[in-house]
């Protein structure tokens, strides 16, 4: 019985579709000319991981400092992918005010899974950002 539980757990984890759904892996954030993108913000996420990282995309270059996001992007990002050897710092209010959080290289298909204080989450909460790569 003790061997059966870990075996069933391993089987269940393998059977689950990719935890990152349709989100690109951080290594894929490169342009055709070889330069890299620091991060991509996506407007749509979904309870199903396979439907995340869709809709309009905001690509952020290394060194981008946006205390105010472009028109239509404030408080709309629901999924996020950060490139290899990069990190993005986000703020909940324009002008780099409010709550803050750093996301390192990786795929974050559902920002509602990341807490912002006691009652909030980061889905539709990003109003400012700074992205850098090493």
Curated annotation (Swiss-Prot):
Q: What are the TM regions of this chain, as residue ranges? A: none
Q: How does it sit in the membrane?
A: Peripheral membrane protein
How is the polypeptide modified once translated? Contains intrachain disulfide bonds.
A single GO cellular-component term on record = zymogen granule membrane
Q: What InterPro entries has UniProt attached to this entry?
A: Syncollin (IPR028137)
Entry function: Functions in exocytosis in pancreatic acinar cells regulating the fusion of zymogen granules with each other. May have a pore-forming activity on membranes and regulate exocytosis in other exocrine tissues.
> Could you tell me what this protein is called?
Syncollin
* Species: Mus musculus (Mouse)
Please name the taxonomic classification of the source.
Eukaryota, Metazoa, Chordata, Craniata, Vertebrata
